[in-house]
From Swiss-Prot:
It catalyses: uroporphyrinogen III + 4 H(+) = coproporphyrinogen III + 4 CO2. The lineage of its organism: Bacteria, Pseudomonadati, Campylobacterota, Epsilonproteobacteria, Campylobacterales. Belongs to the uroporphyrinogen decarboxylase family. It comes from the Bacteria. This is Uroporphyrinogen decarboxylase. GO terms for cellular component: cytosol. It comes from Campylobacter jejuni subsp. jejuni serotype O:23/36 (strain 81-176).
Amino acid sequence: MIFIDACFKKPTPYTPIWMMRQAGRYLPEYMEVRKQAGDFLSLCKDYKKASEVSLQPIDILDVDAAIIFSDILVVPLEMGMNLRFEKGEGPIFDNPISTLEDLEKLDDQNAHKKLNYVYDALKLTREKLSQNKALIGFCGSPWTIATYMIEGSGSKNYAKCKKMLYQNPELLHKILNKLTQVLKLYLEEQIKAGANAIQIFDSWASALEYDKFFEFSFNYMLEISNFIKSKYPNIPVILFPKGISGYLDRIDGNFDVFGVDWSTPLDLARDKLSHKYTLQGNMEPCRLYDKNAIKEGVEKILKTMQNKAHIFNLGHGILPDIPVENAKYFIKLVQESSAK
């Protein structure tokens, strides 16, 4: 698989490419299946439909990897938190965590066993996927998942989380540790179900100041990665902490690919990290609105990463109103322009 070869810095005939949120609302085919499912969470829990939308970007765009369709918050959901998605508001937990008692009510022993709909979707997708295409499993980072569990929803300033971080860091560490243990087992089950690679999304990494990022986020991601790499050395692990371009000098550990977001200069990440890791990224997602902007962005990134191990991706998720034609143009342009 070209994607897996690139993760391990092996030579590839061209630069492999996939897109975060590639199974998503910009595809009319996705919207049709989502309508049939009824709502977002029902789609996540219907393994046949989740598999169907995971495969759509392979069939429509010919990307080099599929990522399983799911959500990072199914983990706290199955630990016993009451999750709902409100239109225009995103995810909401009606019972956010603020005390040790709240945390102790959560089931960390059986949560990974209740996520069979994810594993079944992975199995079905891997069966249907051609052998040269990789299947990516994923989870959120403990820190990013914890922000939703503590805030009760998305947040602009993470005030409740940060209040806990400074007033009661022991409790925050207990929450993060409990999540970490569940996520290890969750990812292991994903690998057993057919995932060829794992990505850990740390979407809210940039909410933390320098030292706190390493203490409350990165160290927990590394604990998960160390667990996976010790048991499954042939499964590449991708870490994607978003918005931490100022923290790159301390990025080190046992993983394979570092995801670069669009706000980080790629040459900076290349100079600091490409001797150790394959880099993934980092096209500004809004460039996909315009074909000239796509061409300019692709040329710049390919030039920056010339002769370095690289997986092409957006610097965050594809937006819902991107024309499908532009997405197709983007994928084809990368694959053809980078052909050796």
